[in-house]
Swiss-Prot record:
Residues 9-69 form the Sm domain. The keyword RNA-binding applies. InterPro entries: Hfq, LSM_dom_sf, Sm. GO terms for cellular component: cytosol. This is RNA-binding protein Hfq. Belongs to the Hfq family. Homohexamer. RNA chaperone that binds small regulatory RNA (sRNAs) and mRNAs to facilitate mRNA translational regulation in response to envelope stress, environmental stress and changes in metabolite concentrations. Also binds with high specificity to tRNAs. One of its GO terms (biological process) is regulation of RNA stability. Gene3D superfamilies: 2.30.30.100. One of its GO terms (molecular function) is RNA binding.
Length: 90
């Protein structure tokens, strides 16, 4: 069986490892900028300068990276889309 693809974890980990600055929008309209230092199933640790914010994921509306993020090559994307279509048809 193929390995499960966890988009959220891969996206957050890519941002963390590559130290890409992000803008985080919360559901209450508040926005903040910083670098993702860590994350788990429920929270994201955002660091900006000397300040850290532990943000609960359920409070996050949108995360916008400062640069483009490619999580997998185009060839894999096409294969995954085909697999998803096959699974939906079953």
């Amino acid at each position: 069986m193929a390995e499960k693809f966890n988009l959220q974890d891969r996206f957050l980990n890519h941002l963390r490892v590559n130290k890409i600055e992000v803008k985080v929008y919360l559901v209450n309209g508040f926005q903040t900028k910083g670098f993702i230092r860590s994350f788990d199933s429920y929270t994201v640790l955002l660091e900006s300068g000397n300040q850290q914010s532990l943000i609960y994921k359920h409070a996050i509306s949108t995360i916008i990276p400062s640069s483009y993020v490619m999580l997998m090559p185009r060839k894999q994307e096409t294969a995954q889309e085909a697999e998803t279509s096959e699974n939906e048809g079953s």
